Amino acid sequence: MARPKLHDFRRIVVKVGSSLLIDSGAGEVRATWLAALAADIAELHRDGRDVMIVSSGSIALGRSRLKLPRGALKLEESQAAAAVGQIALARTWSEVLGHHGIGAGQILVTLQDTEERRRYLNARSTIAKLLEWRAVPVINENDTVATNEIRYGDNDRLAARVATMASADLLILLSDIDGLYTAPPGSNPDAKLIPVVDSVTAEIEGMAGAAGSELSRGGMRTKIEAAKIATSAGTHMLIASGKIDHPLKAIAGGGPCTWFLTPANPVTARKRWIAGSLEPKGTLTIDAGAVTALRAGKSLLPAGVIRVDGQFARGDAVIVRGPDTHEIGRGLVAYDADDADRIKGRSSPDVMSILGVSGRAEMIHRDDLVVGTAPG
């Protein structure tokens, strides 16, 4: 597959590691470098692209502000350092993006937020609303509450999960190396940069070293794992050097990097997962008007639902049937079974008065809905 161009992509996640963002000697943000990156992000934003940032650095910034000694931190020390660093990190991103008239929204996530469907939907909705408002979500693992048993441990895989969650079509991992090499370039003069990876094979995985630093928990192995997550969900990924000023501009200009390509697109991959990999927990029967709307690519609104069967939680997969009981499709429902039954047949403005809270306008959003024949 040919190497893509940066301008081919509409929704982009940019991951920035601690070793790029923080000067390891001074323990402070590399302000000049970050200003250049923010200018690159602003240019993409002006061109109408959705941009999200997955930013490391909270622990590194916190330990600097607290003047902690070098060396490994215990879990509770890391959590406390992150509590201080997250404030500084959020302020930093807000200021550099604000210089370009762009609002920044901080989102702190844990492993469960991307693995438990209800929390997944909440996080995805927050990201979607920020993007709708033309803000830039700045996402980090919530190191203040994550434990060793329930954490990512690196932001490469977190970035891949965020890209999947947001249906991004490109994930950029800015690193201290400009891509995947056939051998460690620091010790092997014959090492060659691999410009395009069509599939993550055992051979590709074997090329990943274990390089990391005191400030950064990740290495090439975690980047390969991120590539597997991203490409399986229909998101292209690339690794490029962030050690230069204006790294995104360099990528756009054809600079050295490694592309990990996928034949699918995010929406197709996600809908394949909904249709074939999730066990339905219930059924929604809808009227003829709703059937027509769904087949025209619309979301399913409460007004179109005439019957609710089964016991399901918010975020579970359900079958959608027409008035003749024929299966119309499958999707992830935005309400649990009890609430869905209470608001069926009612207009969206009635939902708040019935439930006492402001709920989703849709029973199933079109991005969470697969309309077609039932899987075999």
Swiss-Prot record:
* UniProt-annotated location(s): Cytoplasm
GO biological process per UniProt: L-proline biosynthetic process
- Where do the annotations place ATP binding? K15, S175, D176
Q: Which UniProt keywords apply?
A: Amino-acid biosynthesis, ATP-binding, Cytoplasm, Kinase, Nucleotide-binding, Proline biosynthesis, Transferase
PROSITE patterns (alphabetical): GLUTAMATE_5_KINASE, PUA
Q: Which GO terms describe its cellular component?
A: cytosol
- Give the E.C. number(s): 2.7.2.11
Q: Give the catalysed reaction(s), semicolon-separated.
A: L-glutamate + ATP = L-glutamyl 5-phosphate + ADP
Please state the pathway this protein functions in, per its UniProt record: Amino-acid biosynthesis; L-proline biosynthesis; L-glutamate 5-semialdehyde from L-glutamate: step 1/2
Q: Where does substrate bind?
A: S56, D143, N155
Top-rank taxon: Bacteria
Per its UniProt record, what InterPro entries does this chain match? AceGlu_kinase-like_sf (IPR036393), Asp/Glu/Uridylate_kinase (IPR001048), G5K_ProB (IPR041739), Glu/AcGlu_kinase (IPR001057), Glu_5kinase (IPR011529), Glu_5kinase/COase_Synthase (IPR005715), Glutamate_5-kinase_CS (IPR019797), PUA (IPR002478)
What PANTHER family does the entry give?
GLUTAMATE 5-KINASE, ISOPENTENYL PHOSPHATE KINASE
Concerning its family, UniProt says: Belongs to the glutamate 5-kinase family.
Q: HAMAP family from the xrefs?
A: ProB
Know the name of this protein? Glutamate 5-kinase
